[in-house]
Structure formats: structure tokens, C-alpha cells
């Protein structure tokens, strides 16, 4: 079945579709922006890229329909390899979305800095 025909069949009704506040989102694998559009659809297109957090909690899993690779080197090297994958003729139109997704997933894995408690100043604050 062609990609266009598949999209016509699933665009208004599928199990991944979320319709809220006049906007349609999609939870399908391979949809980088989670938007219900033909360009980003993981079901309608043959060539898809799925980027998700690694199960170990460190790194990202980049998967295509044929391969699956876990990238754990850091944000710059991960972004470079994802950009290389998309630039090499494999869905070059998804490059910006893929890089944004890698950056967002890796940003969530950074440890949260604990802010130091501010020292109280003044005569009344130090009076005990």
C-alpha cells in the first residue's frame, strides 16, 4: 500500500491519535514532533527515525525500521551521528526535528543542580 493511501486511511482515526483543544497530536513511534501530519508520521512513511531515552537512563536510542543503536557518548557526538544519519539521504527533511529530540532527551538526563541556601543577611536575621 502506498504511503499516501495509508495516510488517507489513518489521518483522522487511529489508536495513537490525541485530539485536544483543537490540536491533533500522535503518540506513534517514529513521530519526532508528535504531530499528526504526513511528514512526521511513523506509520505512513517507510523511512522513519525514532529517538527515545535509553532504558539504562543514560543516552538515547536511535532506531530506524532496520537498525537500532544506543548513543551514550554525550550531546555533541550524539547530535553529530544523528545529523550524519539524516544528512546521508535518509530523510534529510527530519534533520532539525531529530536534533531537537536528541537534545531534549539528553537534557532530561542531566542531574539537577541543588541550589545552595542563601545566607540570611541583616541584624534581625542573625539575631538569635
Map each language-model feature to its residues.
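Compact, Lys/Arg-rich rRNA/RNP-binding cores from ribosome-related proteins
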Residues: 1-128
Amino acid at each position: 500500500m502506498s504511503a499516501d493511501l495509508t495516510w488517507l486511511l489513518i489521518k483522522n482515526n487511529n489508536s495513537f491519535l490525541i485530539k485536544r483543544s483543537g490540536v491533533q497530536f500522535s503518540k506513534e513511534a517514529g513521530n519526532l514532533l508528535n504531530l499528526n501530519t504526513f511528514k512526521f508520521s511513523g506509520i505512513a512513511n517507510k523511512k522513519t527515525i525514532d529517538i527515545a531515552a535509553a532504558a539504562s537512563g543514560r543516552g538515547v536510542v536511535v532506531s530506524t525500521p532496520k537498525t537500532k543503536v544506543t548513543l551514550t557518548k554525550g550531546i555533541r557526538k550524539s547530535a553529530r551521528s544523528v545529523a550524519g544519519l539524516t544528512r546521508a539521504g535518509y530523510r534529510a527533511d527530519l534533520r532539525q526535528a531529530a536534533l531537537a529530540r536528541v537534545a531534549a532527551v539528553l537534557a532530561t538526563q542531566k542531574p539537577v543542580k541543588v541550589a545552595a541556601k542563601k545566607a540570611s543577611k541583616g541584624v534581625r536575621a542573625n539575631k538569635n
